[in-house]
């Protein structure tokens, strides 16, 4: 078979970079079976460093590709080979990918290490976002920068692992991304779809504000933050040209997901429970949803969330959240107790918490005893352990925070609000997400800076909640001295100097278990390890909190670790600048409640982050 260079037009080109050995066979076979489709053209590239080696390798490549000719003929795939001379494999692959305008570039890695991923990440940096970059190790995707937007719903429906479907881009691409953002305020949510504006102030891109649609809505939101957990962000999915779908498709997904829900509420029952959805019972309002409190005939309190699908993204949001929550069953996770579909209204029904949220309780008049705080910490940890390790499909919550932890009369915690959650992966360490969502003050550095998502982002946020339980402080406070608005930044120097007791909530001084206190501080410190690779998983943290692990082991780990970075790079940052920008337009302490945020990939993404100077082991 000829190996001359042939430029093929009007076809999808898959460029496969291989060595001529067994590992190359594995990569080529995977690309032909998993990536190439009917009518595509697969161009196999082998790079040699000398002309002599290139000349010698041409006949070898012909023999190498021969076994796949029949397979490609059956699938109507055109297979071509190139042996090229170059000083850099990366440089040659990038040049050829641009020349062919390749749809995908597939490379193999011999071991999962930073060095092995260098070529894949280099391609992701140099090639346009329209090119799909995949790195394969033993038949598994170990790195991917996708060329299309993949909704979480599609991840659930597909039979392929979510890690293979997740899209994103390389670390440095994300860090260098520039653009402008439009801010939309609704309730306590902040949505930042990308639009073009001028004179964007450099620095922290996620500006927080207390400005709401009307003063009345603002007052309601503050007053009833107990049910804020049930509120969704106004726009879960940023506008994107590839996101449009036919209404029939959305209807089908609704039916597929909702058919397994055990309890369907009639609209009349919910109408009666909420006094005809009266304004007096309106306890929250989002961009396209409203939440009402109500009481069923048996006296059970419920939070009724009505989603008005004025846009198709709202339907997807509803399906996605319901599909995840309905699959969960754990005593420390707030359950979805039913749904209702009434004409264009999509309604979900949740329990109405009697004690409110952990955030409310910590900031309220009731003082949580130490035993109650430890109980809440362990219960929340068990909920995360269930999501990460016990579900058939792992779940990453992505918005763990004190306002999303509901408390029963016995102070048993329940994790709630799965509107930002996503399906995790058992095969990949992390996925890259185009959109960073979550709450300022709880975002893990690798997620905020590079969009890297794994169960470790929940572990980091759990560490912030532990600090809240220890100190009684909020994750972000405008009343704190400049540079200490972040709870993590406030706690860091005290822990580093060995003055952990200064963290303790003065309301419980003298009434706490000192041994348990030090274990919780140690757990929080390890949860807040800057590099995700060295951050423990939630199961390990739980053992420490329960007293099942020897504390001396954890102290030794803390002393031995050298703040490893793996392939995560956190540049030095001007923390004060970032925090001052984050506090723009904050008018009073009430308005500094934790706002969930979203950002599309085109938004301004500063190359520095205050997270990079947060607690580390």
From Swiss-Prot:
The modification Phosphoserine is found at residue 403. Residues 591-617 have a biased composition (Low complexity). Induction: Induced by gibberellins (GA) in seedlings shoot apices, in tissues containing actively dividing cells. Down-regulated by RGA in the GA signaling pathway. The modification Phosphothreonine is found at residue 439. GO terms for biological process: gibberellic acid mediated signaling pathway; gibberellin mediated signaling pathway; positive regulation of cell division; response to gibberellin. The active site is at 399 (proton acceptor). The keyword Repeat does not apply. GO terms for molecular function: ATP binding; hydrolase activity; protein serine/threonine kinase activity. InterPro entries: Kinase-like_dom_sf (IPR011009), Prot_kinase_dom (IPR000719), RBK1/2/STUNTED (IPR046958), Rossmann-like_a/b/a_fold (IPR014729), Ser/Thr_kinase_AS (IPR008271). The protein kinase domain is predicted to be catalytically inactive. This is Protein kinase STUNTED. It comes from Arabidopsis thaliana.
């Amino acid at each position: 078979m000829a190996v001359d260079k042939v430029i093929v037009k009007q076809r999808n080109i898959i460029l496969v970079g291989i060595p001529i050995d067994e590992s190359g066979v594995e990569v080529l076979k995977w690309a032909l079976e998993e990536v190439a489709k009917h009518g595509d053209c697969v161009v196999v590239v082998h790079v040699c460093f000398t002309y002599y080696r290139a000349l010698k390798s041409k006949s070898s490549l012909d023999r190498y590709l021969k076994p796949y000719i029949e397979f490609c003929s059956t699938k109507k795939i055109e297979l071509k080979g190139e042996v090229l001379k170059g000083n850099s494999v990366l440089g040659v692959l990038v040049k050829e990918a641009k020349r062919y305008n390749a749809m995908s570039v597939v490379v193999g890695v011999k071991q999962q290490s930073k060095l092995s991923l260098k070529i894949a990440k280099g391609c992701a940096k140099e090639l346009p976002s329209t090119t799909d970059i995949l790195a394969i190790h033993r038949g598994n995707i170990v790195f991917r920068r996708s060329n299309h937007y993949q909704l979480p719903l599609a991840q659930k429906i597909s039979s392929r692992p979510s890690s293979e479907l997740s899209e994103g881009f390389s670390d440095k691409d994300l860090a260098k991304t520039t653009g402008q953002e439009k801010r939309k305020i609704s309730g306590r949510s902040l949505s930042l779809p990308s639009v073009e504006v001028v004179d964007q102030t450099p620095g922290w891109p996620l500006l927080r504000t207390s400005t709401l649609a009307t003063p009345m809505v603002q007052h309601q939101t503050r007053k009833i933050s107990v049910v804020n957990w049930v509120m969704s962000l106004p726009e879960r999915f940023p506008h994107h040209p590839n996101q449009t779908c036919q209404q029939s498709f959305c209807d089908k997904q609704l039916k597929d997901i909702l058919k397994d829900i055990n309890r369907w509420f009639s609209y009349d029952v919910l109408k009666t429970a909420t006094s005809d959805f009266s304004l007096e019972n309106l306890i929250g309002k989002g961009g396209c949803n409203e939440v009402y409190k109500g009481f069923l005939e048996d006296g059970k309190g419920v939070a009724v969330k009505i989603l008005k699908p004025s846009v198709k993204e709202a339907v997807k949001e509803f399906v996605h959240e319901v599909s995840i929550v309905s699959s969960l069953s754990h005593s420390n996770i707030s359950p979805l107790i039913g749904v209702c579909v009434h004409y264009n209204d999509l309604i979900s029904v949740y329990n109405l918490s009697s004690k409110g949220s952990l955030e409310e309780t910590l900031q309220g008049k009731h003082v949580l005893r130490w035993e109650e705080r430890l109980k809440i910490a362990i219960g929340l940890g068990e909920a995360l352990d269930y999501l990460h390790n016990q579900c058939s499909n792992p779940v990453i919550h992505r918005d763990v925070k004190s306002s999303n932890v509901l408390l029963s009369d016995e102070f048993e915690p329940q994790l709630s609000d799965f509107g930002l959650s996503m399906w995790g992966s058992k095969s990949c360490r992390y996925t890259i997400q185009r959109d960073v969502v979550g709450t300022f003050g709880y975002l893990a550095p690798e997620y905020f800076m590079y969009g890297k998502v794994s169960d470790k982002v929940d572990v980091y946020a759990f560490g912030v909640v532990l600090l809240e339980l220890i100190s009684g402080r909020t994750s972000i406070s405008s009343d704190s001295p400049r540079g200490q608005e972040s709870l993590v930044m406030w706690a860091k120097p005290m822990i580093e100097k060995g003055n952990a007791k200064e963290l303790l909530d003065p309301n419980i001084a003298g009434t706490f278990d000192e041994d348990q206190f030090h274990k919780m501080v140690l757990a929080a410190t390890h949860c807040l390890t800057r590099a995700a690779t060295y951050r423990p998983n939630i199961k390990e943290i739980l053992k420490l909190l329960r007293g099942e692990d020897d504390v001396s082991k954890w102290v030794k780990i803390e002393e031995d670790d050298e703040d490893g970075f793996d392939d995560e790079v956190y540049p030095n940052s001007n923390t004060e600048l970032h925090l001052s920008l984050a506090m723009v337009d904050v008018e009073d302490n009430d308005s500094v409640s934790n706002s969930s945020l979203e950002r599309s990939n085109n938004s301004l993404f500063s190359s520095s982050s205050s997270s990079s100077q947060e607690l580390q082991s």
